[in-house]
């Protein structure tokens, strides 16, 4: 930029360097069966105009329309940076959907593929430090510093940006909510080994209906739920997580079959565990390549890109993921 200074005694200031974008997501017009229920700005043209306006005013983001015109790619400095824009837009009344964040790679002078790395710091009670170190190791991180106090330990790591995605939730889990985790961009370095994504399969709604307590009571025995009684669900929407790696299509609206004879347990209310809720950041970190986050002024939902189970199966067969 320009420097304004005294012409008689000019002082030249060093230019301010802006960290390069490290992650990108694609914004698309919502294709949800519930589109238009919460927001009044749902069109693809309106979404494009809003993001192009953001490009004019926000120099820290790189915003480009995809060649096939199916969406707008927005690149920023991490998931928090991107989620701030999404939060602003949902408050303005926009409804849209975004895909899984992808890491932006670079090529070094010798042709080596480079990826963004981050410096991460975790502060946690001493008894959880071992679990934190193990969690970072599984995510491709390396511990570079450690300070142990009487009750708290501060751990410093170097970790690829790919490994950071989803790490905040895991750190909170292993520290029982007592860990403090923050990270910042460090450098571009050679790509390390491939990292695995989410290991748990999803429960996927088979129809567009409101969730029923009886059905949820049965499903919570098979995993954790993302919805509660009365919540609107639709075919292809993620409604829970199961401990096994494969997905399972479920009926969230199944009701109890009533017989002629009264059972001694017929009137016992279903005891449900409160559903697991997600922030925008957590949802973006959670989804896989074949999933999307639906963003509205009132809701954050996760869904399959292909809503129909039949379409998902056809796609899997075409790509050799399952046998015919």
Located regions from the model:
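Accessory interaction regions appended to the cores of large information-processing enzymes
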Residues: 1-324
